[in-house]
Amino acid sequence: MEYEDLFKKITAWAHDRGIDQADPRVEFMKMAEELGELSAAYNKEHHAKMVDSIGDLQVALLIFCQLVGVDHKEAIEAAYNQIK
């Protein structure tokens, strides 16, 4: 599946659950939780759990971006422009 299609599906999923109208602090805490899970999976060298945690972290980050009015594409582009 193409990234843009995934983004649209994630956006719809969040909307269907009302997450797109949630308090951004809640989604920020979700990102922290997922980062903790990723850290644990990495430390245990558990690849499948790392894949799951990375995916969950990306979903949470995309939703957080929407909640705080940051275009995720613009953000990654700006980051790339700083490192290139």
Question: Where is each model-derived feature located?
Answer:
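Flexible "arm" and connector segments at domain edges
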Residues: 1-54, 58-84
